[in-house]
Amino acid sequence: MLRNSYKKLLEDTRKYYKNLKKIRCKHIENDLIIFGDSGFSHLLIKDRKLRSIDEQFRKLCLVQYIPQIINNDGIKKETRIIQSKEYGQIEYIALSGNFDNKIVKIILRKLGNGNYHFWSIMDK
């Protein structure tokens, strides 16, 4: 039973995520956020290993909050920049807000001069 509900959640969330494609974000000067395969894969995999089913389930359930976080006022923004030999500058932006009595945070990533793309989501 749990396996079937996980499979349905995975399929439904994948369809929802693919429909997001690109969204302008007022918290990063109206730049586009790209919703590509790497971001969705990161919901399921970390450090080249599958996340636990519980962690995947939790992250998949949070995907519905992405548009609200990107477009709402009252969102907290944190930025971190690191240097990489492979990509040059990597910028991570965390946007978080309170939804349904929990803090939901999305991570955006920008490699070098590329576009921002969705990287992860979590709750506290």
PLM feature spans:
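Ribonuclease/tRNase effector modules and their secretory precursors
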Residues: 1-124
